[in-house]
Curated annotation (Swiss-Prot):
One of its GO terms (molecular function) is mRNA binding. This protein promotes the GTP-dependent binding of aminoacyl-tRNA to the A-site of ribosomes during protein biosynthesis. Residues 91-94 are annotated as: G3. GTP binds at residues 14-21, 91-95, 153-156. Residues 194-196 are annotated as: G5. Residues 70-74 are annotated as: G2. Its main location: cytoplasm. The modification N6,N6,N6-trimethyllysine is found at residues 79, 187, 306, 396. Signal peptide: none annotated. This is Elongation factor 1-alpha 4.
Length: 449
């Protein structure tokens, strides 16, 4: 047995009709874990409904429908393998909460695959002022997705078909846009593909023999292996807390940074409750330690279920333990807010697993989105497309960290009017020590503070 392949997370972005589902579906279909029987069932249904155009998008539509109905589909369906990596598509867009998911997302994407519709009219719609191509690329960059692959899709439908001139024109325009966002286009492969016909997806296409670069599969293999933050102090935001008969209180969540293991003394922020971890489990198996990316349940001693809540963060009490934030300063980009945002604005922040109202107590500066340079001091308000530094005050105890130290706890979505109106990353946090924090007997025995 060789060394197990490295896991990477991919987010697929682009305008509504760019062919994201078809392209993603095609990869999963050809390289993935979808059972042949399931595919045959989908194909039969598609044929019955005369969806000739089915093929790959249909696969994804079925998966999405099942996912939205709350049927948890076998996550293997969203995975595929390249020569070097196991790839997971972390959120197929088109999903209502795509932006929110991308931010509070179950995981950080290692690479964004931007799908461009190369057809006449299609490309222009995607890149226009209202097109999602721009918004998604900006979002990916702001949230620290540093690597990107760009697919010029629907090359089978350009005029003339498989047109090099059209491809060149698109590259020029998209490069200049991605540069404005902050990416370096020289480092981005632009792969001409047809997600439907399969050109340059997995095998080289003879229709595109003027193109000498990598296929999509080869481009995925060329992604730089990301570093996982296991050497940082522990941060584990709680998703749920269960009471399990005969075992006791079991908080559940995903290790974002660091590691957790039995015998460790953990502190839960913001309350400061400190106790010992008795055991750590993943998929009903005991672990000696859990690392970043692992979704685990862990048993804690002498703690009532009511003392822990979703959004609390577990950390190692002896290694930079987490604390609640009195206030914090963030770099915010306003994305789709119809009016003006001034001091006193109080939306809801979605950050890791917490969902808490915060007040924009002070808009400090307006800045250039790309360079981060200050344009204006203490502006009266921010509006759509603006970026600024804002001091925020949570209305309830909340745990956040700076994006530079603990990325998953330092990026957030601002929600208002049932949509994401802004995104941001946290630059500094003013932390406060908890008062009257409970330390359990088990923790004292272990020599906690």
């Amino acid at each position: 047995m060789g060394k197990e392949k490295f896991h990477i997370n991919i987010v697929v972005i682009g305008h509504v009709d760019s062919g994201k589902s078809t392209t993603t579906g095609h990869l999963i279909y050809k390289l993935g874990g979808i059972d042949k029987r399931v595919i045959e069932r989908f194909e039969k249904e598609a044929a019955e409904m005369n969806k000739r155009s089915f093929k790959y998008a249909w696969v994804l539509d079925k998966l999405k429908a099942e996912r939205e109905r709350g049927i948890t589909i076998d996550i293997a369906l969203w995975k595929f393998e390249t020569t070097k990596y196991y790839c997971t598509v972390i959120d197929a867009p088109g999903h209502r909460d795509f932006i929110k998911n991308m931010i509070t997302g179950t995981s950080q994407a290692d690479c964004a695959v931007l799908i461009i519709d190369s057809t006449t009219g299609g490309f222009e719609a995607g890149i226009s002022k209202d097109g999602q191509t721009r918004e998604h690329a900006l979002l990916a960059f702001t949230l620290g997705v540093k690597q990107m692959i760009c697919c010029c899709n629907k090359m089978d439908a350009t005029t003339p078909k498989y047109s090099k001139a059209r491809y060149d024109e698109i590259i020029k325009e998209v490069s200049s846009y991605l540069k404005k966002v902050g990416y370096n286009p020289d480092k981005i492969p632009f792969v001409p593909i047809s997600g439907f016909e399969g050109d340059n997806m997995i095998e080289r296409s003879t229709n595109l023999d003027w193109y000498k670069g990598p296929t999509l599969l080869e481009a995925l293999d060329q992604i730089n292996e990301p570093k996982r933050p296991s050497d940082k102090p522990l941060r584990l935001p709680l998703q749920d807390v269960y009471k399990i008969g005969g075992i006791g209180t079991v908080p559940v969540g995903r290790v974002e940074t660091g590691m957790i293991k039995p015998g460790m003394v953990v502190t839960f922020a913001p309350t400061g409750l400190t106790t010992e971890v008795k055991s750590v489990e993943m998929h009903h198996e005991s672990l000696l330690e859990a690392l970043p990316g692992d979704n685990v349940g862990f048993n804690v001693k002498n703690v009532a279920v009511k003392d822990l809540k979703r959004g609390y963060v577990a950390s190692n009490s002896k290694d930079d333990p987490a604390k609640g934030a009195a206030n914090f300063t963030s770099q915010v980009i306003i994305m789709n807010h119809p009016g003006q945002i001034g001091n006193g604005y109080a939306p809801v922040l979605d950050c890791h697993t917490s969902h808490i109202a915060v007040k924009f107590s002070e808009i400090l500066t307006k800045i250039d989105r790309r360079s981060g340079k200050e344009i204006e001091k203490e502006p009266k308000f921010l509006k759509n497309g603006d970026a600024g530094m804002v001091k925020m005050t949570p209305t309830k105890p909340m745990v956040v960290e700076t994006f530079s130290e603990y990325p998953p706890l330092g990026r957030f979505a601002v929600r208002d009017m049932r949509q994401t109106v802004a995104v941001g990353v946290i630059k500094s946090v003013d932390k406060k020590d908890p008062t009257g924090a409970k330390v359990t007997k088990a923790a004292v025995k272990k020599g906690a503070k």
